[in-house]
Amino acid sequence: MFKGMLGKKIGMTSIFAADGTLVPVTVVRFGPCVVTQVKAEKTDGYNALQLGFDERALAKCNKPKVGHFSKSGSTGFNVVREFRVENTDEFEVGQNIGLDGFAIGDKVNVSGTSKGRGFAGTIKRHGFSRGPETHGCRNHRKPGSIGCSAWPARVVKGRRMPGHMGVDRKTVKNLEIIDIRPDENLVMIKGPVPGWKTGLLEIRKAV
């Protein structure tokens, strides 16, 4: 059974569990995904499935993608991702992949792109402490010293400084599936997941 899927984040809400507790959940619409390519260890060196998600008309795809998607006998896709598998014998090009590999209570890892925050300072970006507010202090939100003077006479690599924040690939691990609605391709995952509404998400079974 395949244990990976592509989807879009819908938003957050809360539902009541069986014991009456209120559980915050993220609603995600996963799949359906189509197998656009099967990679085998004999030919490619490893076993993997290439999945297409979010259908797109072939007329809006470039020629290399049209040729690639035509082999699967399906329309074009906006998103194509690769998932490693142990064995590819049970899969074929053009096959639809659903939520059969997931069940309520499973632990999953969810990957996505974090929200963009623009240019941010060290307090917001790295969690620095702020300076004193009174007694003539003029160092309220400044980062402070960023290096030495005589030696090494440069700013070392990796120094935490102000800059662009967000739009990074993030993975949240061991999230619990609270509910699955196969008819609507909806999965409710406990807690928040990376990204904005309608953002692309990848779900994998936690090891």
From Swiss-Prot:
Source organism, top-level taxon: Bacteria
A GO cellular component entry from the record: cytosolic large ribosomal subunit
SUPFAM superfamilies, per database record: Translation proteins
Residues making up the signal peptide according to the UniProt record: none
Record keywords: Ribonucleoprotein, Ribosomal protein, RNA-binding, rRNA-binding
GO biological process: translation
Gene Ontology molecular functions: rRNA binding; structural constituent of ribosome
Similarity field: Belongs to the universal ribosomal protein uL3 family.
Assembly behavior: Part of the 50S ribosomal subunit. Forms a cluster with proteins L14 and L19.
Role description: One of the primary rRNA binding proteins, it binds directly near the 3'-end of the 23S rRNA, where it nucleates assembly of the 50S subunit.
Name listed for the protein in its UniProt record: Large ribosomal subunit protein uL3
Organism whose genome encodes this protein: Desulforapulum autotrophicum (strain ATCC 43914 / DSM 3382 / VKM B-1955 / HRM2)
